Amino acid sequence: MNTNQRIITIGTICLIVGIISLLLQIGNIILLWMSHSIQTGEKSHPKVCNQSVITYENNTWVNQTYVNISNTNIAAGQGVTPIILAGNSSLCPISGWAIYSKDNSIRIGSKGDIFVMREPFISCSHLECRTFFLTQGALLNDRHSNGTVKDRSPYRTLMSCPIGEAPSPYNSRFESVAWSASACHDGMGWLTIGISGPDNGAVAVLKYNGIITDTIKSWRNKILRTQESECVCINGSCFTIMTDGPSNGQASYKLFKMEKGKIIKSIELDAPNYHYEECSCYPDTGKVVCVCRDNWHASNRPWVSFDQNLDYQIGYICSGVFGDNPRSNDGKGNCGPVLSNGANGVKGFSFRYGNGVWIGRTKSISSRRGFEMIWDPNGWTETDSSFSMKQDIIALTDWSGYSGSFVQHPELTGMNCIRPCFWVELIRGQPKESTIWTSGSSISFCGVNSGTASWSWPDGADLPFTIDK
């Protein structure tokens, strides 16, 4: 075969290969068109998916940390029917507390992308429970985590994620710019309250379903602040309490009633010699009960109870089982402030049952270590220090921190009563440990009328991290 014949043969082969490739591409186009036509035809028949629920689940690995990006239920041809959370039921009768969630965020944060945060709290709608938290605009084990022991900065934001998940940029939802916050669901939408700005002129921004609906300007210009736990919704109205004034003396306290994020009523408490901060509030038979922190002068906790018209009663938990930290050793209680070792404090909670009270408190009387639940059958009204039950939550040797209440409504649980629950913040890092950062994880428990366990569920992270060395 001469040179010209070789060239002709090679050219012919190339031409044949090109034609075959072209035919294959045309075939692919035809198949894709047919597939699309079939799918389009199926979509024109809604009866195929009528009243069905299709679940899409996307997962990914980020820095070797498993993160569930979304788990969204889409009802074909249907929307989620809004309801109104009534809040008229009484608290469920309980005999103890069952562990509900633990996010292990500090342990996971040694390797994964986890927010530096504090002041976590939990709130539930009729469909889900979410963990809310105040970030520092930084991740664990990163240089921007340096100095995050500071409470108030322009970088702090309120965000939320599904309960029990470690809060990361991949599963968290932005809620508000805030260094003090609250949130709750009325059955139709999320209300968020985020306070930010300078100490002498902060502003609370109210959002309903993510849209700004109202604001509250600091009225004493001395660090306006709110609950750091969920607000309360009853029959379409939501309620919160705010403080403005000194943290170590008489301050000003206001109750607010809101509907769809708009303030419709507010009153200032007449409470001389009382100190209310960081109140943990819950609904009970159509009223709101708040148990708060006295940072001024008491070892026991103040409370305020009010109806939907903001008519209120005030007092201190009478029990000689004291709930604040630091505090005196248990002894003789008082239905006013117990002044011994009462300066400073920590956010906490209690649940009233008639004359009795479940008291959540640190095990240590002087530092934020350990946690326990105590049932005092007459502690709301009597001053002795006897109690009938104690359940261990965190060992004395392990760090705890803030704690607060949340509830699960009958519309979520299917029960005929409001289930009481609580969360505990497990603070790690500065100022007690050799790190450049301060952050926390959280655990939560819910009340049950069946078997429970006493144990310790600590944070468990091995410190310091690489960034700290």
Swiss-Prot record:
> SUPFAM superfamilies under this entry?
Sialidases
Superkingdom as given in the UniProt entry: Viruses
Q: Which family does it belong to?
A: Belongs to the glycosyl hydrolase 34 family.
Q: Which InterPro entries match?
A: Glyco_hydro_34, Sialidase_Influenza_A/B, Sialidase_sf
Q: Which residues lie on this side of the membrane: Virion surface?
A: 34-469
Intravirion compartment ranges equal: 1-12
Q: Which cofactor does it need?
A: Ca(2+)
- What positions does the entry give for substrate binding? 118, 152, 277-278, 293, 368
Q: Which GO terms describe its biological process?
A: carbohydrate metabolic process; viral budding from plasma membrane
Q: Which residues are glycosylated?
A: 50, 58, 63, 68, 88, 146, 235
Which residues are annotated as active site? 151, 402
Name of the featured protein: Neuraminidase
Indicate how the chain sits in the lipid bilayer.
Answer: Single-pass type II membrane protein
State which residue ranges cross the membrane.
13-33
- What else does UniProt say about it? The influenza A genome consist of 8 RNA segments. Genetic variation of hemagglutinin and/or neuraminidase genes results in the emergence of new influenza strains. The mechanism of variation can be the result of point mutations or the result of genetic reassortment between segments of two different strains.
Sorted alphabetically, the keyword list is: Calcium, Disulfide bond, Glycoprotein, Glycosidase, Host cell membrane, Host membrane, Hydrolase, Membrane, Metal-binding, Signal-anchor, Transmembrane, Transmembrane helix, Virion
Record's GO cellular component terms: host cell plasma membrane; membrane; virion membrane
Name the positions where Ca(2+) binds: 294, 324, 344
Disulfide-linked positions: 92-417, 124-129, 184-231, 233-238, 279-292, 281-290, 318-335, 421-446
Q: Which region ranges are annotated with the description Involved in apical transport and lipid raft association? A: 11-33
Q: Any idea where this protein resides? A: Virion membrane; Host apical cell membrane
Q: Region Head of neuraminidase: list its residue ranges.
A: 91-469
Q: Write out the PTM section of this UniProt entry.
A: N-glycosylated.
* Primary location group: virion
